[in-house]
Every structure is written in structure tokens, then in C-alpha cells.
Amino acid sequence: RFGGRVRFFISGSAALNQDISRWFDAMGMQIAEGYGMTESSAASTVNRIVAYKNGTVGWPLPGMEFRIAEDGEVLMRGPGVMAGYHNNPAATAEALDADGWLHTGDIGEIDDRGFLKLTDRKKDLFKTSNGKYVAPSNIESTFKGLCPYVSQLLVHGNDRNFVSALVTLDPEAIVGWAAANGMEGKSYA
């Protein structure tokens, strides 16, 4: 057992790297990831030790409701959601709709068991010329996870009919790969 009486961790604030979560899980230590915003009195969902799914932020806390808008945005409402921004009716109208749903600005999905998975930020999406919304951070993080030789990756395609990426390599990683593959001293340019 990890740390004597420690049974689990709770993670929030920023997305938890799934490799880290899986590593702790393999050691018998679950990290219960949660989700919330200042506008929802902090915690709104959390994985439970008895109902846990890696890669998600869990189920809604009691009294909270979640749904996904047509554009993929996560909407929430419940007793912990703010009534509005102080002295800022324009910002309130942008964040809360007439039915009391808080528009979080996050993109996500709810699976058939009710677990919420966050996938991106709405403001980070771009739209191709054929109308498809693309979440570049998913592509970027997946590619970087598959290729240890990449230093930076930028996916773009706003108003184009294709998506492309600008990739820069990690010089140290490439030199190491070249040495291991009989190409030491060769240029990677």
C-alpha cells in the first residue's frame, strides 16, 4: 500500500495525464479526478472509488445535471451554479441560458454510464471550410504521445478544406535515435 493509510488521491484544476493516472492505478492507488468551475462552487463531478473510470472526471455530484450541447459544449446546472456575475448582466447572459444551464466553454462527452469526459476548450476549436469542428489539442497530444521525437506540434486548418500540422523535432531525441540506428553524425535537416 502506498503511504500507509492513504487510499486514493483527488485531482482537479487541470486535466490529469492518463499515463500518470494509469501508473498510480497499476500500483493500487486510484486518482479520483474531478471537475468544476468557480461559477459552479468548485466541484461539480468526481470519480468515486466505487465508480471509477480512468480518463473521465466522473459522475455529477448530487443535485448537479450535465448535458452536451449540439456543438459539444458541456452544460451544467444545479444548486451550486451561480446566479450570475456581480454587476455584469452581459457576461451573465453569455454564460447562463434561460433554462439555467451554465455554458462551461469546455467540450466533452457523456458515456452510456454517465461518466463525463472533457476533450477540449470550445475557444480552441477551429472550423474547416466544410463545416467540421476540429479539436487541435487532441490531435497534438495524441501525436506527441505516439512519437517521442516531436518537440512541438501545431495543428491548423481554420477555413480550409484540410487540416495540417507543423512539426518540430526534439534535437536530443533525434540524435539519440540516429545513434541507435547507425546514422550517428548525419543531419536530420
Locate each region found by the language model.
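Core catalytic subdomain of AMP-forming adenylate-forming
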Residues: L96-D112, S129-V155
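Gly/Ser/Thr-rich phosphate-binding loop
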Residues: R1-Y52, E65, P148
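Adenylate-forming
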Residues: V81, F115-T142, I174-Y188
